[in-house]
Amino acid sequence: MFPRDARLDMYDPELAKAIAAEVRRQEDHVELIASENYCSTLVMQVQGSQLTNKYAEGYSGKRYYGGCEYVDIAEQLAIERAKKLFGADYANVQPHSGSQANQAVYFALLQPGDTILGMSLAHGGHLTHGANVNVSGKLFNAVQYGVNAQGLIDYEAVESLALEHRPKMVVAGFSAYSQKIDWARFRAIADQVGAYLLVDMAHVAGLVAAGVYPSPLPHAHVVTSTTHKTLRGPRGGIIVAQAPQEALVKKLQSIVFPGIQGGPLMHVIAAKAVAFKEALEPAFKVYQQQVVKNAKAMAGTLMLRGYKIVSGGTENHLMLVDMIGRDVSGKDAEGALGQVHITVNKNAVPDDPRSPFVTSGLRLGTPAVTTRGYQEQDCVDLAHWIADVLDAPADVTVIAAVREKVAAQCKKYPVYR
């Protein structure tokens, strides 16, 4: 019925052309978006397998459909590997995304109208931590904390807000914060007011797995994550916990299915299993150590060139460049760097006077370039080229020269050999 040698370029040339162009873009452009990475060919192979055909509502051994004996194996492998990777006693690998993992925890442990205390999006948090444009800020009474003048989380202010508002849940985690978080301090604050502590470690999950960033699992009631970003797996979500009470496990299991999702994506769950196996390899720790080394090299070079990094540096995979007071906006910078084939994203910075669609900042991250094989000197060079462009975004001579250097660097480090 379906020939294995069918060619997409023959059947749907328009789509095939777009995919081929994206493949070329990934090879020919430097990827510095902190939330992006390249997954392995094995992960892609599994995600494109016949497992996509199988419906498997429920959990391993307790399905609502027959014929699930083999996908049960795949899901159980993902669960056991996730538990081993993070030192967890519980893992749910069915969430379709990190946002849905967060949503599941909210719905499992909260009632509409309950108060949550999360990090402000404008100060480095995530949409799902209570932003008013997100369901987390619409269904719940969201109180937001931020960073101090040094760009660091103000734990005293977090504690004061918790004592004032008595949240049912404290949310820790970020999408644009470059320092280590004191998970124990967050748990102490949550305990003071009898709140749950949810940690969203989506950005640093790979670093946590490799032991190069503090693990939140000993401190949080529940931890969520994406499975891509620094974990380098397929796009998806996960919920893990260490020594959870049985009542909590039951709530989480029942809210993921049937509470907010139906059939799990078995091809994605199997791909998660592959990614977790890869993350358990010794080489993964070496990779994550290099991610941080590269980020430090890049941030240090940008600061030497006169660019401000929020919080004064980085202890993880990302950095936030603060361009308040400069003529070039985040939007302008993103466009100028795009011309030289360096892909970044504009990002709001604390106390940003510009709109979220323009911004005064850039978020940069090193997971993807480190996957390509970049070392510290490569990232020093890259940071100088970024500064060259930001110093003269309209100078066609600079743009042409940097684009040529980027092309040579990309050729030196292909993604898929």
Swiss-Prot record:
(6S)-5,6,7,8-tetrahydrofolate binds at residues 121, 125-127, 355-357. Its EC number is 2.1.2.1. The record marks 228 as: Plays an important role in substrate specificity. The keyword Translocase does not apply. Pfam families: SHMT. The modification N6-(pyridoxal phosphate)lysine is found at residue 229. GO terms for cellular component: cytosol. It catalyses: (6R)-5,10-methylene-5,6,7,8-tetrahydrofolate + glycine + H2O = (6S)-5,6,7,8-tetrahydrofolate + L-serine. It comes from the Bacteria. Its cofactor is pyridoxal 5'-phosphate. It is found in: Cytoplasm. CDD domains: SHMT (cd00378). InterPro entries: PyrdxlP-dep_Trfase, PyrdxlP-dep_Trfase_major, PyrdxlP-dep_Trfase_small, Ser_HO-MeTrfase, Ser_HO-MeTrfase-like, Ser_HO-MeTrfase_PLP_BS, SHMT-like_dom. Pathway: One-carbon metabolism; tetrahydrofolate interconversion; Amino-acid biosynthesis; glycine biosynthesis; glycine from L-serine: step 1/1. It is an enzyme of class 2 (transferase). Keywords: Amino-acid biosynthesis, Cytoplasm, One-carbon metabolism, Pyridoxal phosphate, Transferase. One of its GO terms (biological process) is glycine biosynthetic process from serine. One of its GO terms (molecular function) is glycine hydroxymethyltransferase activity. Signal peptide: none annotated. HAMAP family: SHMT (MF_00051). Belongs to the SHMT family. Homodimer. Catalyzes the reversible interconversion of serine and glycine with tetrahydrofolate (THF) serving as the one-carbon carrier. This reaction serves as the major source of one-carbon groups required for the biosynthesis of purines, thymidylate, methionine, and other important biomolecules. Also exhibits THF-independent aldolase activity toward beta-hydroxyamino acids, producing glycine and aldehydes, via a retro-aldol mechanism. This is Serine hydroxymethyltransferase.
